């Protein structure tokens, strides 16, 4: 997504190494070529995506030692689904969904799914599985600041 408040921009500041590719879901051949080129150096990338055949968080925890890359699709739910369904390569990856108990903090973002997460929130949920010492509040602090800025930009309703 190319929105100035895109949460992937915050990820670039917080994570290293991170590889971000901009995909056009309207051209399946180009989409697959870019994904193939990006993932060719990895032997067992895992996709974090709530597809119909995605495994749950417990299965993800059991796979933590066997993967060498995590793949997240950033964008609106409509765009993310389109990228997933246009890419035969992404559909072949082992995919996992994150079972969450709380709604997203990103209230400004609209989603048709009740318990959908922004990309940075999904990354944070997965990182919590890796490291017992992972401080998700510290990791998400720039995201919380971004939300605060966005809320301040919304015109106040007159009473």
Question: Where are each of the predicted segments found?
Answer:
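Short N-terminal binding/cap micro-motifs at the start of the first secondary-structure element
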Residues: 2-4
């Amino acid at each position: 997504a190319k929105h100035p408040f895109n949460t992937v921009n915050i990820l670039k500041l917080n994570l290293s190494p991170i590889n971000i590719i901009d995909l056009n879901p309207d051209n399946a051949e180009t989409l697959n070529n870019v994904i193939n080129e990006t993932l060719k150096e990895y032997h067992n990338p895992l996709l974090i995506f709530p597809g119909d055949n995605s495994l749950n968080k417990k299965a993800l925890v059991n796979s933590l030692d066997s993967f060498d890359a995590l793949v997240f699709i950033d964008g609106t739910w409509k765009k993310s689904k389109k990228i997933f369904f246009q890419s035969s390569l992404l559909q072949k990856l082992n995919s996992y969904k994150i079972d969450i108990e709380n709604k997203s903090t990103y209230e400004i973002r609209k989603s048709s799914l009740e318990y959908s997460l922004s990309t940075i929130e999904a990354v944070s949920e997965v990182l919590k599985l890796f490291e017992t010492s992972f401080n998700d509040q510290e990791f998400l602090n720039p995201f919380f600041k971004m939300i605060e800025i966005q809320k301040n930009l919304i015109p106040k309703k007159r009473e």
